[in-house]
């Protein structure tokens, strides 16, 4: 058999490259985000005068450009700092990768040239190692550090707000927090909130025309000439605009549509491929969400699918009865079930509707599955 990679690599493709369709790629220009770049820059610019900039909190739904804009501003500040020979560092931490205070501080120490292991030291030793980096006799001039905590809500839920407390209590450190959730500060204790000197920047969703502009720029360098039409770009943009203006989703639609064209050995992307791509992405997204749910939430979802198949009306009380049978001895309280229901609804897997049973009978929550039941079953099998 010939080398499979050579065979695939030599196959005709409508792609010139896929890298520009990856949401992690940071282009030279970010359409419709100039004002947000300036908003970040107006705070960070203080570091060029050797002043620690204020903390920043950036909000916005998935795919609104929060991370891309922040990393774009990071690159530009680093360029100016290098030209002026200033000791300014901007370090990016994704809190899904480093989700405890210890891990984040160890990572920052490593990025700043101090080898600290990810385990084995006490918390006090790691904190001291981090703070020692800011002494003049270690790095010469005062170091100004801007720490970008992307998906900061993850560490707050997982490990509390200790990392924010430590960073805000360290001289010459500024925090830029990024979150999809505008209410994430509910996880921060008052004494830590008071030490945050944060300025807030909100990223609105992209509209359909803005998404068209983004996709046009990316498609020019991603596809062979004539492979993509304005109609395809408009369709991808319209579908993504309905998904709360998610540019990541728009890029994923475009890339998946191109992959389908390659599979069908078509030299152009047809609009029907976009619709097929939408189904693929949604199926993949649902499976990814379900398999990463905590085991107890999976049990609740499994109980909902069971009752759905039996065509029963799903009240929280009936749901808890079935859940108890499934979970057996490893179960949570009835009150905790309400939290799981709310979280599953936020993820779009279910919906709830409060109805009145009539005078004197109170109100009842009715739960409805919002996804293809076979797909949920498939995802629940994957977890095993």
Swiss-Prot record:
Keywords attached to this entry: ATP-binding, DNA replication, Nucleotide-binding
Disulfide pattern: none
Record-linked Pfam families: AAA_22, Cdc6_C, Cdc6_lid
GO biological process, one term: DNA replication
SMART domains hit by this protein: Cdc6_C
GO molecular function annotation: ATP binding; ATP hydrolysis activity
Binding site for ATP: 64-68, 206, 218
Keyword Zinc: no
PANTHER family xrefs: CELL DIVISION CONTROL PROTEIN 6 HOMOLOG, CELL DIVISION CONTROL PROTEIN 6-RELATED
Function: Involved in regulation of DNA replication.
UniProt similarity note: Belongs to the CDC6/cdc18 family.
HAMAP family: ORC1_type_DNA_replic_protein
Name listed for the protein in its UniProt record: ORC1-type DNA replication protein
